[in-house]
Structure formats: structure tokens, C-alpha cells
Design a protein with these regions (language model features):
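A short beta-strand-loop structural module common to alpha/beta enzyme folds
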Residues: 35-46
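Helix-adjacent hinge/juxtasegments
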Residues: 50, 54-90
């Protein structure tokens, strides 16, 4: 991992369909000395509940990030983006992860267990956590995203 960003903490959540990939992500980041807190289910759960848990933690903890996993990542990304201040991105490859950090300052990464293999997920995590926000013209665009949420 090139020059990894060191967030204050990474919050990882998944529903039952993303549990195995979420556990892999947890171990991968712990091996790189990231501070991790997990919200992983012991039974069948509803993904919006876990998206909410992780997003609330990210909003409460400056300089933290979230990772959400479900079967496809779609439901988690939809749920996460309902929160003002959350910029969640469903990433399917390292380029998407790099660009969402560079241009969108994403603070929540969404992954799909049935979509991405372990090798791809490793490259996504490396790109996401080694790319800094470019700022510049992108700051106004992000402000406009938050303005569109009335909550």
C-alpha cells in the first residue's frame, strides 16, 4: 500500500450476505495497523440498519471512514448516501476507489461480496486508503451534494 492514509478509525459493517468479505476486510486492514471497529451480524439482518450504524459512527468521529458490505454493495450504498455528510461509493475496481477519493472525498466504501473477488478487494482497499482528496473544484461539488439533503 503506497503512503496509506491513516484515518482515526475505520468502521466496518455488513449484513449477513456480506459477512465473509467484511471479515476479510477487517483482517486485511488490521494487518496494516488500522484501528478497526466492526458491526457484523450473527444472523439474518436488514442492511439499512447496518448502514445507519456505520454512518452514524463516521459522522461522530472526525477523520474516520466506513466500509459497508452486502451481497452487491448497492443496498448499502443507497442506505449510506441518505445521511448528510456521508459520501458513500460502491467501487468495483481500484480505479473507481482512487477516483472516488480523489474527486468525491468518499468517506464510506461499499463492496459487494458476490461481485468482487479477494484480489480485487485488496486493490480497492489499497487505492482507497492511499489516495488523498484533490480538493480544488471538487469542494464546491461536494457542498452541493450536502445541500441537496434536507436532513
Amino acid at each position: 500500500m503506497n503512503k496509506p492514509l491513516k484515518p482515526s478509525q475505520v468502521f466496518i459493517g455488513s449484513d449477513h450476505a456480506g459477512l465473509h468479505l467484511a471479515e476479510f476486510v477487517q483482517h486485511f486492514l488490521k494487518d496494516k495497523d488500522f484501528k478497526i471497529q466492526t458491526f457484523l451480524p450473527a444472523m439474518r439482518v436488514d442492511y439499512p440498519d447496518y448502514a445507519k450504524l456505520v454512518c452514524q459512527k463516521v459522522l461522530e468521529n472526525a477523520q474516520s471512514y466506513g466500509i459497508l458490505v452486502c451481497a452487491t454493495g448497492i443496498g448499502m450504498s443507497m442506505g449510506a448516501n441518505r445521511f448528510k455528510g456521508i459520501r458513500a461509493a460502491l467501487c468495483l475496481d481500484a480505479y473507481m476507489a482512487k477516483m472516488t477519493r480523489l474527486h468525491n472525498n468518499a468517506n464510506v466504501l461499499c463492496l459487494g461480496e458476490k461481485i468482487s473477488g479477494i484480489g480485487v478487494v485488496e486493490s480497492i482497499l489499497e487505492a482507497f486508503f492511499s489516495t488523498e482528496f484533490e480538493q480544488g473544484r471538487h469542494v464546491l461539488r461536494i457542498q452541493k451534494l450536502d445541500e441537496s439533503l434536507k436532513s
